[in-house]
Amino acid sequence: MQILNGSNEAKSPSSISLGISNSYAINPINTNRLYIQSSMSFKSLPGRNNYQYYPDIGFGYKVSKNLALEGSVFNHSFGSFSDQTIRGGVQYYFGSSDTLSWVSSLKKVSYKSVKNFNLNNITIELSKWIKYRQNFFRFGLGSNFYTKDNFLFKQKGQVNFILLSTIIPVSFFQLSFETRMNLDMFFYSFSLLKDFH
């Protein structure tokens, strides 16, 4: 489940764009092919009591050693609001012949807040995976390009960010902590991941 936590600032197009584009941690180093991820990302806003949520559960599948697909369809109701998120993307792994530790990804997310607005988002990322003992670390850069349509006018923009994450094996699943940030926003993500052969 992916959740963006906030109020007025969280409802801005740039903030929503960054909140709904959480990356799927499909590990390029191990050989497992199917991934299921449940995550919660949020932005902390001191002094605010109102929260807006954006849930998501998604999957990833390695088509080959250096190519993976990701996607999800999630509908969620909160009070009198009903929201739908549809996402799909591709990840390409590259690096040395024996270790594909670099990842470039392209993802499109369509967020529909019924009776309020639609937001279409394209995310481009470049990241590096590093293994230390049993843990994995990932860092990279990315950009979101969004279009918000509130049925009266359209608003376009771009959000650039830095990505840092840690993936820790716990029993039969993995726990991930991720940060996406720029000079204006700071998002946290907590994820549970399960991979299969």
Where do the PLM segments sit?
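Outer-membrane beta-barrel transmembrane domain signature
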Residues: M1-Y51, V109-D184, L193-H197
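Flexible, solvent-exposed coil segments and beta strand-coil junctions
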Residues: S64-L69, V103-K108, I168-F173
